[in-house]
């Protein structure tokens, strides 16, 4: 086995190990998020997601799967979701005029309504723009959920529920976040179909 092959194998093993640690911790937080998100959607609320870098990509990824579909055999109506990290004109305007730190807070205050949900994704738990959005969400009676790492960081203080990956390795945290995100989406999708809120097409 070459050195490069060993490094790839080690990466895969580390990724599996982090997910096994997540399994040991349990998934009560994901279930609790799923219950609240289902309740919000059934009350005509929406899900907002935000993050930076790879976590911004995760926010867009999960919002797209809510709006369109996650599983090919579930051709269903869309679930109201929006990534706050996808509009380059808004992102650059805010960064230029007011600063990047307030980006998600400003958008959330404009779009968010009582009864909505916010999912903030930050591997460090300390992304300032995500934390400011969480604070604003609390003021607006919006449920706040976190996909976090590194023990949760400051963001944990503002979360109604949080899924914390027990790692400080950014790549491994991101991999666990997207797995948890898919689990959460499947939970919500199943509940909304079972309740009759979502119709299969």
Predicted regions and their residues:
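A charged, well-structured terminal subsegment
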Residues: 110, 171-201
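Short beta->alpha connector loops at strand-helix junctions that form conserved
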Residues: 85, 122, 148, 163-171
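Glycine-rich, small/polar surface segments that engage phosphate groups of diverse ligands
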Residues: 35, 39-111
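Generic N-terminal amphipathic, Lys/Arg-enriched alpha-helix
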Residues: 1-25
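Short, glycine/polar-rich helix-capping loops at beta-to-alpha or helix-loop-helix junctions
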Residues: 147-159
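Short glycine/serine/threonine-rich phosphate/pyrophosphate-binding segments
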Residues: 56-60, 126-133, 155
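Short, well-ordered beta-strand core segments
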Residues: 118, 144, 161-163
